[in-house]
């Protein structure tokens, strides 16, 4: 086996110059142990197998374009598996000779006297005479109303009809009322969810701005990835829990949350102060405190039954409580300024400068315009996370 054979080769594989890309033996046998190079090389009795020289033909085949395997491919011996694409026309279905299997024609309608015998009774003179009965008219024309005259209905029938209408109550709500009742809460929920998702992005945006201050001119990279717990390259604003920078990220976001709450509280105090609803008592002229005695509550309002709260201050004369009304606006701001001026005397030196600066209104406006033009884009990047808070502040301003 494997030596030179004097017999000429028979069957497939005679042309040994053809390459053998998939490892077939020249005699088209898969293994020498099954009779390769023997007297019976054609041991695989495939009646429709193709010959080896046809492998040089360009075809689609099961092994890709350009090669048709000798055995017909792994998909079988069909023409499609050997790369021969044929189009078989679709045979139309035979016409049905049975007309009864299709749709039947609509049968002729029976006469009205057979299908609706009650209609014949409605058209009878006896039926029209029955309609003229006062008891029957009371059902169709209550309260004596009639097209032919005033007819008093039977009392028991009318009372029965009224009792039925009283039990039924109001008519069923229309689809328009139901839709309007559901549409409002859905819009409020959608707007609230949108504002909530936008507000939750504020800490991350402020955290990115905070960390960018430490990487001026470069991209922020977490320094914890070079420590004993190596992690992949990531931003310091998205540290995983195993990163040492995770605790610093949580601390920064906690400080940012406190800052946002403080900002909302300041806005609420300013709003309540502007509407005169903060119980802040102004300083008594000539004193540094708001009360000089034990009285700190006020039992009666300053000006009648006012809805705004009042502040109770004590007179230094007889010690009786006197309710002093809160100023209409900016009482809290005035109180803070007076309190700070008492504690820090150097703030009083700024008053003339502020008054002089405010008096130069054209200069102030031009300065503000110039600063916004120069610092506007940078301020927008800093203040853009706070834009979702503006609708909340607006709602508080309108409804409080």
UniProtKB/Swiss-Prot annotation:
Applied relevance: Systematic vaccination of individuals at risk of exposure to the virus has been the main method of controlling the morbidity and mortality associated with hepatitis B. The first hepatitis B vaccine was manufactured by the purification and inactivation of HBsAg obtained from the plasma of chronic hepatitis B virus carriers. The vaccine is now produced by recombinant DNA techniques and expression of the S isoform in yeast cells. The pre-S region do not seem to induce strong enough antigenic response.
Region called Pre-S2, residue ranges: 120-174
Region Pre-S, residue ranges: 2-174
Compartment(s) of residence: Virion membrane
Virion surface membrane side: 2-181, 275-348, 399-400
Intravirion side: 2-253, 203-253, 370-375
Glycan-bearing residues: 320
Keyword vocabulary terms for this entry: Acetylation, Caveolin-mediated endocytosis of virus by host, Fusion of virus membrane with host endosomal membrane, Fusion of virus membrane with host membrane, Glycoprotein, Host-virus interaction, Lipoprotein, Membrane, Myristate, Transmembrane, Transmembrane helix, Viral attachment to host cell, Viral envelope protein, Viral penetration into host cytoplasm, Virion, Virus endocytosis by host, Virus entry into host cell
BP GO annotations: caveolin-mediated endocytosis of virus by host cell; fusion of virus membrane with host endosome membrane; virion attachment to host cell
UniProt superkingdom: Viruses
Subunit structure: Li-HBsAg interacts with capsid protein and with HDV Large delta antigen. Isoform M associates with host chaperone CANX through its pre-S2 N glycan. This association may be essential for M proper secretion.
Domains as described in the record: The large envelope protein is synthesized with the pre-S region at the cytosolic side of the endoplasmic reticulum and, hence will be within the virion after budding. Therefore the pre-S region is not N-glycosylated. Later a post-translational translocation of N-terminal pre-S and TM1 domains occur in about 50% of proteins at the virion surface. These molecules change their topology by an unknown mechanism, resulting in exposure of pre-S region at virion surface.
Name of the protein in its database record: Large envelope protein
Designated gene of the protein: S
């Amino acid at each position: 086996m494997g030596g030179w054979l004097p017999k000429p080769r028979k069957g497939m594989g005679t042309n040994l110059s053809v390459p053998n890309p998939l490892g077939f033996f020249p005699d088209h046998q898969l293994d020498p142990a099954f009779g390769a190079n023997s007297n019976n090389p054609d041991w695989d009795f495939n009646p429709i197998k193709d010959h080896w020289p046809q492998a040089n033909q360009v075809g689609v085949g099961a092994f890709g374009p350009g090669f048709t395997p000798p055995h017909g491919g792994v998909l079988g011996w069909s023409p499609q598996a050997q790369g021969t694409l044929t189009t078989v026309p679709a045979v139309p279905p035979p016409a049905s000779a049975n007309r009864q299997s299709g749709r039947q024609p609509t049968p002729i309608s029976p006469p009205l006297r057979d299908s609706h015998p009650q209609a014949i009774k409605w058209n009878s003179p006896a039926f029209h005479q029955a309609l003229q009965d006062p008891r029957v008219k009371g059902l169709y024309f209550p309260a004596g109303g009639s097209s032919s005259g005033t007819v008093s209905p039977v009392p028991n029938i009318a009372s029965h009809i009224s009792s039925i209408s009283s039990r039924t109550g109001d008519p069923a709500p229309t689809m328009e009322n139901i839709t309007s009742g559901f549409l409002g809460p859905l819009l409020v929920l959608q707007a609230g969810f949108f504002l909530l998702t936008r507000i939750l992005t504020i800490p991350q945006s402020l955290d990115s701005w905070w960390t960018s201050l430490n990487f001026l001119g470069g991209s922020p990279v977490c320094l914890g990835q070079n420590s004993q717990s190596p992690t992949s390259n990531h931003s310091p604003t998205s540290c995983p829990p195993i990163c040492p920078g995770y605790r610093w990220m949580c601390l920064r976001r906690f400080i940012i949350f406190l800052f946002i709450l403080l900002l909302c509280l300041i806005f609420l105090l300013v709003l309540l102060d502007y509407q005169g609803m903060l119980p802040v008592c102004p300083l008594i002229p000539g004193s540094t405190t708001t009360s000089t005695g034990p009285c700190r509550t006020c039992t009666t309002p300053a000006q009648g039954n006012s809805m705004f709260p009042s502040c109770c201050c004590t007179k230094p004369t007889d010690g009786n409580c006197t309710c002093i009304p809160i100023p209409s606006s900016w009482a809290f701001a005035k109180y803070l300024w007076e309190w700070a001026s008492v504690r820090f005397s150097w703030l009083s030196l700024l008053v003339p400068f502020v008054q002089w600066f405010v008096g130069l209104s054209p200069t102030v406006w031009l300065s503000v315009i110039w600063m916004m033009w120069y610092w506007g884009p940078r301020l927008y990047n800093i203040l853009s996370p706070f834009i979702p808070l503006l609708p909340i502040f607006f709602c508080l301003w309108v409804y409080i």
